[in-house]
Structures are given as structure tokens and as C-alpha cells.
Amino acid sequence: MTINQATIDFIRQHQDEDVRQLAFLGSKYPEVNMPFALDQIRGRKMAHVKLPRWASIEGIIYPPHISMEQCSSEQTALYKAELAARLLGLSVSSSENEKECEKASNSHFFKICEFASEGAVDSEFAKNEDTCKKQQILTECDKYVNKSKEKPNEEDFSEEIEFVDLTGGFGVDFSYIASRLGVKSMYVERQAHLCEAAKENFERLGLKNVSVKNGDGIEVLHSFHSKKNAASDTLGITEEQSQSLLKTNFGLKLIFIDPARRDDAGNKVVSLKDCTPDVTVLQEEMLSKADYVIIKLSPMLDWHRAVCELSHVREVHIVSVNNECKELLLVLSARNMGMNMVSGTDLGEKHDENLRIFCINDSQSFVCDETEMASSAVKIASPDKIVSSSVKAVKKVSSDRITSPALDEMPYLYEPNASLMKAGCFGVLSERYDAKMLSKNSHLFVSEESVEAFPGRAFHIIAVSSFNKKELKRQLSGITKANIATRNFPLSVAELRKRLKLKDGGETYIFATTLSDESHVLVICERGI
């Protein structure tokens, strides 16, 4: 990719300025490739928040705005890299890597390593120091980044490829996964300008053993040998030994695919079959050619429906950042997923192959399986355990609010994080943490004892009020502002705030909800337990 000096100088001189104003300067700088320059200035600003490590490296080429919006963040890319490493049996990290991770400017990588070592990302990784030393983690401190001058290979070397990204895009996911795995990897992308940018960027990121291919991902998939053919050609394994060859090291180890979720008119689609390419059609071919397939989908898609439309789905990963659901990942495999929890190696014996659901939100993680979901029932709190109609034996609390002794039985309230809300595993939550929901549709939990490990936000209930005017006045006495949320409630937050005459913010949290007896209440809380 050739960029003239005038354009480079313009980008450096105006990198902190408003691109909307810079767009009017085209006639003043005729030698500058203005569309490209604006993409770089805008892209780098977005990268400071979304991809801080990339933003810190000089010379990274950013794509047009739409591609920057759609690409993964550094945090979610790191999660996928660790997921891929666990599937391929790599070590979570050596002691050296842990030290380097602590030095990194982005601490999310170290948290993800903790998930894996504690089993939240399924199990411990195989301890393999030699493999770990070969890995080049993109979040290491500067002296470990951008030292290699080796350019990405132009050859396909498809017979040696172990990881392929069939829908490369901007290359964020590919770069982190390829770097983490340390195997020969292929990036495939139909758009030539993204391929050109990828070549430049992978060189600056110090990626080795990677191939950039401008082409159609489906055609590239067709070019790979199946595991059966690869083993047959190399070892003479026959068709009757097909079960054994799933454990061979020939052919692809991992396929990553991120199907486009917009139609030709640019409208978002909600069905897996409407995405491009259609993975429901490609799944059998992908599984015949790779040990594992990771499909990245929109969090808007119904994961239950997606699992039904696909075969061999072994894991569902719902990934949130700052309590905002960002990605839905499906792991497919036709091989035995049973793993030795100590060594991370395949024991070759029959294991429980229930679908597992991983709910991730920053440092919070929650894992369950479909059998547990099916057998678990949500416990519903009795209304009289939340607020009593009796007025005798009352006691005073802060700000002269009055509550009944019955409230003391359930003084803690919990709001599940976004990933759990998407997963819908409320019965498992209820049984695992001995917590009860206020009502079937409230998705708010209460408990007698504090549960510090609850995956979500935790609150201490200081009062519960009905909508009786006198009671409202008493319970809200001294409160001028509050953070208000509604759950299974007839009024919107704006309508309720206007009615209560409360400003936004402060340290008080009010949840307006409906109890199991259909009564409407305000649960007044303070953050923390």
C-alpha cells in the first residue's frame, strides 16, 4: 500500500483534530489523499478506546468507519484467543508470560488468564512451556512488540495451515488468535483494501507464520483437505478408521468464521440462515476439515435457535464488556470434547457431552450446562418475605424510613449481568446461590445471606415501598436523586422519575418491579453488600 508523504504528514499534524472540520480542507491540500487521511485520524481515535495496543503502534492502517465499528475490541479478541488456545490444548501462560501481562497497559488479558486457570473458561490448559515461549502476545509491553521485520507470507501453504479465519475483516480477531496459537495461520478476506491493510498491520504487529489471501472464504474452505483425506494421504489411514483420525494432527485445527449479519440492502438480519456465508450449509464441510470451529455471531441472535440450526455445537459463549452484551460465540466440534481437568489432554474415553454455556462479563464468569438448566427451577420469593402489610413491630432505619422485620429475611438484592440475562439460566442461578426471584418476569433476585460471588450487581435493601402516597413520602424522605431501573413494571424510567420527582444519580438505587402477587413496589437499595 503506497501512501505519499503529504498524506502521512497531514495525518500526523492533524491526528487530534475533528475529522468533520478537516473534511472541508480538501481543496487546501490537493496532494493529500483526504478520504484515506480522515479514515486514519478517525480510526486511531476509535482505537485508543477499542484497541489501545494497536493505537500505541506507529503505522497501523485503519479501515473505513464501518469496519472500525464492526471489528472486535481488544478485550473480546483476547477472550477469543484464550478460548482458541484452550481448545488446542495450549498452556494458559507460563510464569514469564504472567509477569509480562502484568506489565501490559491493558489489564484485561491478565483477567482472562485468571478465568482459564480457575476453570471458568472450561479447564486448565496443558502446561507446555516450550509452546508458551514461542507465543507472542500482542498485549506485552513495547519491547516485545513490533520487532519483527518478517512480512506475512504471500504463499498459501494450505497443507501446513492449522488455523484459518475465513472472514478476516480488519484482522483484529485473527491477529490475536494467530499470535496466541503460534501456528501457521491464514487470513482470508474478499475486499482487497482490507487485505492490503492486513499485510501492513500484521508486519507492524510482529506476526509470523501468517498468510494473507484475498479471496472468497468459501472457495478457500473448499481447497483444504478433509481430516480423513489428509490422514489417508500421509499415513495410509483407511476410511474404516475414521474415528481414530479425529485424533490425528493432520489438517486444520481451527476455523474461525464471522458471517456478515446484514443483507444486500444493509439491513440487519436475525436468522442464522440469513447471514453470509450461511454456516448452516457449511458446517459439515468445516467439521470435516478442522477439529474445531468458532462461529462469531451478533448478540441479538437467539442462541437457542442457533444451536438448533447447527449440529455438533458444544459450547455457547456470551461475552459482555461493561455489562453490555457484545458477542455470541459458538464452538462446534465433531470430536470428543472431554478434557482431563489436570493435564488438559484428551483421554480418549466417553465424557459428558452436554452443551455448556459460558457467561462472561469483564472479570465475572459463570458456566453451566444444558442438563443443569433443564433440571433447575427458579425459586420465587413470597411477597410477605419482601414487604409485609403488617405495621406492628416496626423498626427505624436510616433517614427515618420504616421497614418491617420481614424485610430482614431477604435484605440482599441482585441484578444478573447482561450475559446471564441473554443466557436465561435463571433456575441455575437460583439453585446455585440459594437466591429467589421477586417474580417470574422480574429477573431480580433476593437472598437471606449475602452472595459475594453472584455474577452481576449486588445491593443492600434499605426499604421497600408500595405506591401509597404517604408511604412513598416516608420511604423517600431525604432522597433527592437516585438511579432508577424498572423490571416488569408498567411505567418507563422517565415516567417514574417524573412522578417521584427525583433527579438522576447519587448513591441510592431504586428498582420498580412487580412481585409474584402482582403488587407494584419500589425496592430502595444501596450498592454493595
Each PLM stretch: what is its role?
Residues M1-I529:
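SAM-dependent transferase fold signal centered on methyltransferase-like domains
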